[in-house]
A protein has these predicted regions:
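Flexible hinge/capping segments at coil-to-helix
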Residues: 122-143
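Short helices/loops that flank or line small-molecule/ion binding pockets
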Residues: 69-83, 96-97, 116, 132, ...
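Periplasmic-binding protein-like
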Residues: 29, 33, 103-119, 209-248, ...
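Extracytoplasmic small-molecule ligand-binding "clamshell" domains
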Residues: 20-91
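Sec/Tat signal peptide C-region and signal peptidase I cleavage site
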Residues: 13-19
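A local structural motif
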Residues: 53-64, 79, 160-175, 215-218, ...
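An extracytoplasmic/periplasmic, membrane-proximal ligand-sensing/linker region
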Residues: 21-32, 36-47, 238-304
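Pocket-lining segment of extracytoplasmic ligand-binding domains
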Residues: 138-242
Length: 304
């Protein structure tokens, strides 16, 4: 029979707590991108922030920036622990950190899909019904680090549609965000703009209609990309593995343990009929083609 002193027993009991990552990370910050206006994105992510705070037992803060690069650089500078990226902004973070990021989860939709689509929109009354009709017009991409708002449409325009944007359109610019691009199309600032949707019932402009930002029938889709893998929840690779797993596991159970909070987080509007069902584990291999595509785009720019 083995006997333990009181001191030894206390040490054994305390050992797991002594190694807990919370001692070094009493505050966790997660960054969110600028796809919608700041008030709405903060409101939509608040239920998840509160859930993580209660579940993990540490303070959780939301970090926002005026553009995608602000969140990417915050992660590269170790100012935030977690980022909710799109596929292209994840690839940008991967490059900016020399591979120092780890993706763990992406969105899982009720259909079983883990992807979405880049689209180009125009005003329905503009007479622009296809990309060919937009020759010489003003086109807006969303942000240089946006997957659906820039990288995918730019890549496909050149390699699939045989359109070089800088030569085909009269003007090529960046709107700064998806909502700003759609708004610019509606008010006539842009003739066309790149954004995203999940399907005909759910996407940026449909959600803007539901929020009363634009009217039904003002915006029409004129082009659609192949499916894009949804962007991942991403962690700095220099974080404790236990922290990464604990936060990932907490996000995974958010849909079932806070049903109302998840509804607010996932829908943007009560009219969304293709709700996000939850999350699915992913790894970097799912996004390597995006990294390669971004490198191709950079090479095209250098060559030009």
């Amino acid at each position: 029979m083995r006997f333990f002193t009181t001191t030894a027993l206390c040490a054994l009991i305390a050992a797991p707590a002594f190694a807990d990552w919370r001692e070094d990370y009493a505050v966790l910050k997660f960054g969110i991108l600028s796809g919608e206006n700041e008030k709405d994105r903060l409101q939509r992510n608040e239920p998840l922030r509160a859930f993580l705070e209660e579940k993990l037992g540490v303070e959780v803060e939301i970090f926002t920036a005026g553009n995608y690069d602000g969140v990417i650089q915050a992660m590269a500078a170790d100012q935030i622990e977690i980022g909710r990226f799109g596929s292209s902004s994840y690839a940008a973070a991967y490059t900016a950190t020399d591979g120092g990021v780890i993706p763990t989860l992406t969105n899982l939709r009720e259909s079983g899909a883990t992807g979405y689509y880049s689209i180009v929109v125009s005003r329905c009354d503009s007479g622009i019904e296809t990309l060919a009709d937009a020759e010489g017009k003003v086109h807006a991409f969303a942000d240089p680090d946006s997957t659906s708002g820039y990288a995918v449409p730019y890549f496909n325009m050149i390699n699939v549609e045989n359109i070089v944007p800088e030569e085909f359109f009269g003007t090529v610019t960046f709107s700064g965000s998806h909502e700003a691009g759609v708004t610019g199309v509606v008010n006539g600032t842009f003739d066309t703009a790149a954004t995203w949707w999940n399907n005909e019932a759910d996407g940026v402009y449909q959600r803007m209609i539901a929020k009363g930002m634009i009217e039904e029938g003002q915006v029409c889709k004129i082009w659609e990309s192949p499916e894009i893998t949804s962007g991942p929840w991403t962690f700095r690779s220099n974080l404790p593995p236990e922290l990464i797993e604990d936060v990932t596991a907490a996000i995974e159970v958010f849909p079932t343990e806070d049903v109302e909070g998840f509804r607010i987080y996932s829908e943007w509007s009560e009219d969304n009929d293709n709700n996000q069902a939850g999350f699915q584990r992913v790894n970097h291999e799912r996004y390597q083609w995006i990294v390669d595509m971004r490198e191709w785009i950079r090479e095209q720019r250098r060559a030009g």
